[in-house]
Amino acid sequence: MTEFNIGKMHMSDNWIEACPAGKVDEEDVIRFDHGGRTFAIYRSPDDGYFATDGLCTHERVHLADGLVMDNVIECPKHNGRFNYKTGEAMGAPVCVNLKTYPVKVEAGKVLVQLG
């Protein structure tokens, strides 16, 4: 697991620098902590970047320790699965969706809008 705690503010609309874009491998997830909260940053097979809350909605385990494949993150504790693009819970044991956040890449940096 890679963990970042950069957290630089960009512009006035709450875009936060999460990590360098090159630090997230294709079909992988990293942890990002900011302001006492934790998030998960994903890179899809088509080179898109996505962000969700970092903890599984079932038992609060960090998703950055999970398995990513085909736009799905699987929780490392009980194998609950979420679509990380939409946050949709994909069956038992998870039944509550993940919160998702807008993401963009500028100047080689992944920015997440938390506001």
Model segments located where?
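Zn-dependent metallo-beta-lactamase
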Residues: T2-H34
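Rieske [2Fe-2S] iron-sulfur-binding domain
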Residues: V24-G115
